[in-house]
């Protein structure tokens, strides 16, 4: 998988998995889980670094934060 495809997958996982979970959790619990927020912040920090510096390590870090955010979403259900 190319770096661009990996980047697209991160955005897709955010839109299709993480964002819907956040909506569900906000409706159910009336709050935004800080652990998920911190992972999302880290995802987009690494993606912006990748766009500026082009380092694969930032894509890898964003992928790891994406997986942790997804796991945190399931933890809250």
Kindly label every feature range from the protein language model:
Residues 1-77:
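N-terminal extramembrane/targeting module of integral membrane proteins
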């Amino acid at each position: 998988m190319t770096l661009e495809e990996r980047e697209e997958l991160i955005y897709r996982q955010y839109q299709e998995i993480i964002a819907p979970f956040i909506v569900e959790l906000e409706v159910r619990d009336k709050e935004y889980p800080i652990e998920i927020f911190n992972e999302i912040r880290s995802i987009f920090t690494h993606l912006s670094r990748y766009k500026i510096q082009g380092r694969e390590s930032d894509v890898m870090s964003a992928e790891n934060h994406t997986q942790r955010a997804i796991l945190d979403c399931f933890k809250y259900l």
